[in-house]
Amino acid sequence: MTAKDIFFDTDARAKLKVGVDKLANAVKVTLGPAGRNVLIDKKFGAPTSTKDGVTVAKEIELADAVENMGAQMVREVASKTSDVAGDGTTTATVLAQAIYREGLKNVTAGARPIDLKRGIDRAVKEVVAELKAISRSISSKKEIAQVGTISANNDPEIGELIAEAMEKVGKDGVITVEEAKGMETELKVVEGMQFDRGYLSPYFVTNSDTMEAELDNPLILIYDKKISNMKELLPILEKSAQSGRPLLIIAEDIEGEALATLVVNKLRGTLKVCAVKAPGFGDRRKAMLEDIAILTGGTVISEEKGYKLENATLSYLGQAGSVSLDKDNTTLVEGKGASDAIKARINEIKGQIEKSTSDYDTEKLQERLAKLSGGVAVINIGASTEVEMKEKKARVEDALHATRAAVQEGIVVGGGVALIRAIKGLNNAQADNEDQKIGIEIVRRALEEPLRQIVANTGTQDGAVVLEKVKEGEGDFGFNARTETYENLVEAGVVDPTKVTRSALENAASVAGILLTTEAAITDIKDDKMDMPAMPPGGMGGMGGMY
């Protein structure tokens, strides 16, 4: 077992504080509209320029092991806030640094860390309640655009794009961010349900200009196994041909004789037909086939349910207004499924999302939800250089997360003012002893820090003066760091999602509390000999040690 170094008491806390400060100081320069960029060196390719707090935090690794532990604890604040709310990572880092700094002074002066932590936790609970009380819900396109603009570092183009995307696909719709081929940033909306499988043979194409297969008012056969034998497919083909409507076949695979027969009949004009592989794999494929069946009002023909392909009737087939397929994607528009069944399926998927513990599963469930509830919007990011493209893409993703958070829990006044207004909630915080009172006061002081930092980043204003003026005002009155004026911030479009502000405070207090109650830090002893590269062997094999 490797030998360990142990640091106790003030030694441990002092080193942890150095790590906390190094990371927080690098992150907090990005806060607010006047925040600066941070350049991050990459081993390969050009350096990355970012104004995103969590991106900066994730890149920081310190040489001293105890300092690094402090830095990593604060990095956790940024990461957790990003995961939960998608934005507010810099605010969370600033709050964590402030709570730890103020708390450490009191621990060094003899306060009991555990009581400080209890006081901090009680204070945070009251502040969160106050934030919820002053929160207001949003619904209009203009309000959504304001949130997106602020989170994208005051880029109104991005705010407008996100608002337009949400308007078109709904708040449950999937909005994805991709890199464009050109310099223009644009929004593309795919109506209906789209999945990433294209036609099985180019001979199914009906429009040779666009190389797409287009089926109007088709019947849709959904089968969960491979089809290789024409005999089992023939009865349902004959029935659909008699109906005079095109047929789309979705199956695990269609091969051999079955595929060849379909192609020949399509080319002769005997059948209007197209075949496509089912999307997904394993259990996810079964779920997606069921989604398609519910959306189109059909039935998944599955032997597990007791259905056989050769016995299928027209009542088993789904229907849609139109279907278009290219070599990569299939899009179903105007599925004819019962709206009650679709709503029930949507609610079932929402329930699965709430219970899901895996980020990957949650993402896939949200994609399925969006496909059922109205479509997919794609924001294609254009830029002159790759560095600019990556930076802009990160900002759009941040803005998208923040906008979703705003739709969920509403908005509060931005610019650090909501935390100042929420200070009055501390009047309700109960303390059992003097140290808990100090914990409450620590939070009172820390809540001022984001506003101080936003002002400091302007480089032209005094944080203490601005803070006092904001405290004298009421409601939405605050300091707009972009225009360096005092005004009604909500009317000026300076707003933050309540979820972002709440998550930032809760996560900051949680990690700062753990750091304050830390009494020892244990690290591996660094052995310089272990770090040296191995000596190259002397000479070559069979050369008698010659060089």
Swiss-Prot record:
Keywords: ATP-binding, Chaperone, Cytoplasm, Isomerase, Nucleotide-binding. One of its GO terms (molecular function) is ATP-dependent protein folding chaperone. Pfam families: Cpn60_TCP1. Its main location: cytoplasm. ATP binds at T30, L31, G32, P33, K51, D87, G88, T89, T90, T91, G415, D496. Disulfide bonds: none annotated. Residues 538-547 have a biased composition (Gly residues). Its EC number is 5.6.1.7. InterPro entries: Chaperonin_Cpn60_CS (IPR018370), Cpn60/GroEL (IPR001844), Cpn60/GroEL/TCP-1 (IPR002423), GroEL-like_apical_dom_sf (IPR027409), GROEL-like_equatorial_sf (IPR027413), TCP-1-like_intermed_sf (IPR027410). One of its GO terms (biological process) is protein refolding. Residues 528-547 are annotated as: Disordered. One of its GO terms (cellular component) is cytoplasm. It is found in: Cytoplasm. It catalyses: ATP + H2O + a folded polypeptide = ADP + phosphate + an unfolded polypeptide. PANTHER family: 60 KDA HEAT SHOCK PROTEIN, MITOCHONDRIAL (PTHR45633). Forms a cylinder of 14 subunits composed of two heptameric rings stacked back-to-back. Interacts with the co-chaperonin GroES. Together with its co-chaperonin GroES, plays an essential role in assisting protein folding. The GroEL-GroES system forms a nano-cage that allows encapsulation of the non-native substrate proteins and provides a physical environment optimized to promote and accelerate protein folding. HAMAP family: CH60. Belongs to the chaperonin (HSP60) family. This is Chaperonin GroEL. The lineage of its organism: Bacteria, Pseudomonadati, Chlorobiota, Chlorobiia, Chlorobiales. The gene is groEL.
